[in-house]
Amino acid sequence: WVHENKVSIESQLDEYGAILFSDLPVENAEDFDLFVSAFKYDTFTYEESLSNAVRINKTDKVFTANEAPSEIEIFLHHEMAQTPMYPKNIFFFCKSASQYGGETPLCRSDYLYAELLKEDASLIAKFEKNGVIYNSIMSNGDELVSGQGRSWQKTLGVSSKEEVELKLKELGYTWNWLEGDNLSVTTRTLKAIKELRNGNKSFFNQVLAASLGWKKNSNNETSPVRFGNGEEICNSNLQMISSLAESLTLLRNWKDKDILLIDNHRVMHGRKPFSGEKNREVLVSLTA
């Protein structure tokens, strides 16, 4: 079915940025792996990424969505835009929808860029000129109570402090060791705006997720995200970006067996808190 419809699927993905598949005969991680494999895209493996969200692998290509506790909201973001390496497409599979909440909000970042340009062209110019830098706290061992709880050992694929410092130096990152061998890491400057294949631009970053949901470094109150020149992004601008993004956000309840394909270069996603007796289980596969 995918082979017969791939051209149409990709055409619609180019136009809309996301496609929802419903009622396909996909029941589990293995079926989902076969569905994703049918597209014949290059796999973007989670083990080799620099993401610091806790995930659990189900197959070589399939893993759980962020394992953060159900009461935590994961704010709008582009997958792994806080790192130099990020996937092109994201496949989500809802194996089991939650009883209440748990939606995956979607926001077109090319639309957001256009709205921000109209609202404050000088702010967009600062993002384009300076880019952004991110500061995150990596724990010594997985921290399951956080949306960014993957340990520095797993995030960077190392086992010792000497190895992690060498890896961070190669990446052009800076770092400070904290109490308990936790690690404060600051990225090199990364782009905040992405030029798309059609010539349009998207607000491609993790500014909202970092500013609204990440922990500050309690040692020096370093903000999780700043302009690349070190300047703080003022709260009024963050609130304006958040408000515009919310006005462009689509929210739909998951149904069991739904599959969602999104273009990670153009569409941000998140996760709403959830509750109820039915356990939410959403699986993910990334492609390059």
Question: What do the PLM-derived regions correspond to, one by one?
Answer:
Residues 26-41:
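Glycine-rich loop at the start of a catalytic domain that most often binds anionic cofactors/ligands
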Residues 40-52, 278-288:
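C-terminal end-helix/capping segment
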Residues 1-8:
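N- or domain-start disorder-to-order transition segments that initiate the globular core
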Residues 9, 18-22, 258-262:
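Generic beta-sheet signal
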Residues 12-18, 25-28:
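Short, solvent-exposed loop/edge-beta patches enriched in aromatic
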Residues 1, 14-15, 70-75, 85-288:
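Active-site environment of non-heme Fe oxygenases that use a 2-His-1-carboxylate facial triad
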Residues 44-78:
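A gly/proline- and charged-residue-enriched helix-loop-helix capping module
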